[in-house]
């Protein structure tokens, strides 16, 4: 009883509450599991108006929402109403320091983190009105400078390079940095030569091309919606592992029957140049590729340290680009460009030298 009395009010933004002056809200103590920390929390659900058929409910607990300064329903920043990754990225660019929200990887650490009285990532800024206004002023100044100086200023060039070339440049740097890391023992255990519909009786699957912005709970919800049930996980082992640094993970069902049902619900597939099929799981605007994993997996299947995780993600990036018929950056890209420039200069000089006598003959 005391816990219910001392419990803070829900943290719900004005956009989710709507324009109605009076809203009837239903409170259910320990009514759901938090999508972030996985602990039970007090669930609230309501309608924005009496005529509305859409029921809005809280997805995360008050503690996790306060730590990240986000709405419990839409999970957007409470002040700016944008995704927390976009918020953190903007603040990092303006302040020239990393303020990204680091999420825990396993359930135990998620629960431990939720009990701390801290502000994570950009919540340190947007939870303070003066700090948030300061960031907005800095952003306005940057935009004003960009529009007033013209398209040839270093600011515009740097900004363009950041969005167009940052991903490729970082990948080339990582290829060089982690070139000596050996992950052959990891790759040989991955089912990369398996085909999606070849062995549908398995209950385990390998997931790759997982974007860093996709949380684990969203994959769980998508699978639950596909199957039409919530209790599909294997209670005796880890049913879902997502390693965001490696950009891959594993999915395990209670039975092979559920695995077959999952395969039948996947409508989109990809056929690689080698003739192998990949299932495609659509989440938001991203495509996660799926392969049956008959041997199963463990937490160590994706690497035991950060270096192995990143090297695995680079190897899978190459695989994805090969399967999609795309080219991928290599170490020699910049050198090849420089050699091309040097060669073109030499040819230009030779041509100019040969053309001078011809010009003199014409003028005589």
UniProtKB/Swiss-Prot annotation:
Q: Where is the composition biased (Basic residues)?
A: 339-364
Q: What is its main location?
A: nucleus
Q: Which GO terms describe its biological process?
A: mRNA splicing, via spliceosome
- Family assignment? Belongs to the SLT11 family.
* GO MF annotation list: pre-mRNA binding; U6 snRNA binding
Q: Which organism is it from?
A: Saccharomyces cerevisiae (strain ATCC 204508 / S288c) (Baker's yeast)
- What subunit structure does UniProt give? Belongs to the CWC complex (or CEF1-associated complex), a spliceosome subcomplex composed of the U2, U5 and U6 snRNAs and at least BUD13, BUD31, BRR2, CDC40, CEF1, CLF1, CUS1, CWC2, CWC15, CWC21, CWC22, CWC23, CWC24, CWC25, CWC27, ECM2, HSH155, IST3, ISY1, LEA1, MSL1, NTC20, PRP8, PRP9, PRP11, PRP19, PRP21, PRP22, PRP45, PRP46, SLU7, SMB1, SMD1, SMD2, SMD3, SMX2, SMX3, SNT309, SNU114, SPP2, SYF1, SYF2, RSE1 and YJU2. Interacts with SLU7.
**Where is this chain's protein located in or outside the cell?**
Nucleus
Alphabetic keyword roster: mRNA processing, mRNA splicing, Nucleus, RNA-binding, Spliceosome
CDD domains reported in the protein's UniProt record? RRM_SLT11 (cd12265)
GO CC field: nucleus; Prp19 complex; U2-type catalytic step 1 spliceosome; U2-type catalytic step 2 spliceosome
What the entry lists under InterPro entries is as follows: Cwc2/Slt11, Slt11_RRM, STL11/RBM22-like_N
What this chain does, per the entry, is described as: Involved in pre-mRNA splicing. Facilitates the cooperative formation of U2/U6 helix II in association with stem II in the spliceosome. Binds to RNA.
Task: Indicate what this protein is called per its UniProt record.
Answer: Pre-mRNA-splicing factor SLT11
The UniProt record's further free-text remark is:
Present with 4260 molecules/cell in log phase SD medium.
